[in-house]
Amino acid sequence: MANSIALAEKFVPVIDGIYKKASLTAILDAQTQVSFDGTNTVKVMKVETTGLGDYSRENGYANGNATLSWEPFTLTEDRSAELSVDRMDDEETLGQAFGMIMSEFMRVNVAPEVDAYRFAKYASTADISSAAAALTDGAAVVSALRACASAMDEAEVPAEDRVLFITPTLYGLVEDLDTTKSKEVLKRFSAVVEVPQTRFYTGITLNSGASAWGYTKAADAENINFLAVSKSAVLQATKMALPKIFTPDENQTKDAWKFQYRLYHDAFAFENKVTGIYLHKAV
C-alpha cells in the first residue's frame, strides 16, 4: 500500500510549483514571510516621527516626538476542497488522472481565486489613490498611466518595487501605439503583469461550496482597468496551504484516491503606506 505521507511530500513541491506559475500576485510575496505560528493575528510595528525644527543656541535642539504603534493583521480566509478519483479511472489512465486533476485544480481554481481576492482587497483599501474612466484607446491608457506614475512619484513611492497589473486588452492598446516614446510610461514600473478581467474586480464574493464554488464578482463591484502596487505597501500571508492525499486502500468511504486541500491565508495593506496603491477602475 502506498504511503500517504510520502505521497503528500512528493506532491507538495509540484502543487507549489503549479500555484506559483499560475499565480499573478505571487510577485508581491515578501522574501521573508511573517510567521502566524500559534496564532491567527500578528502585529507589525509602525513608526512615526516628527520632522526637523530650528536649533536654538539658547535652548538647544527642537523637541520632537517618535511614536511606535502596532498594526494588527488577522487571517480571515479559510478555504478548502475535497476531490476524489476512482481507483479504476486512475489505473486506466496509467496513473495520470489523479495528478492531472490536482494540477487543474491549482491552475484553474486556486490561483485565480487567490489573485482575485488580493486584487479586491487592495482595491477596496481605504484612502488609496484612485481614478475611474472608460479607456477606449492607447492614448487614453497612456494618459491614465502617467497620472498614476506621477501620483506615486509625488508620494515618493519607490519606483523600483512598483508593479503594474493591467488587463490584456488595455496593455494591447498601449502596445499597438506607433511610437516607442508613447510607451515610456511603462518604464516607471518595475514590472508589468497582465491580468484577465475575470480576476480583476474591486470586490468579490467567496462562495461557501454549499450551492456554488469558488468566487464571483460582487454585486456592487467594478471592473479594474489597472492597479499599481508597491511591494512594500502590502503583506500577503499564507499560514497553511496543506494537501492531504489518501490512497484507495486508506479511503474509508469509497474505492478512490482522495485529495483534500486547505488554504488559510489573507492579504493586507499597511495603513501608513496606502500611497503605494493606485487603482484605476472602469465606469
Spans of features found by a protein language model:
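Intrinsically disordered or highly flexible coil/loop and linker segments, enriched in small
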Residues: L24, G53, D115-F119, P158-D161, ...
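Structured, hydrophobic secondary-structure cores that serve as assembly/anchoring elements
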Residues: T41-K43, T49, A62-N63, S69-L94, ...
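Extended, solvent-exposed, turn-rich assembly/linker loops in the middle of proteins
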Residues: A126-V193
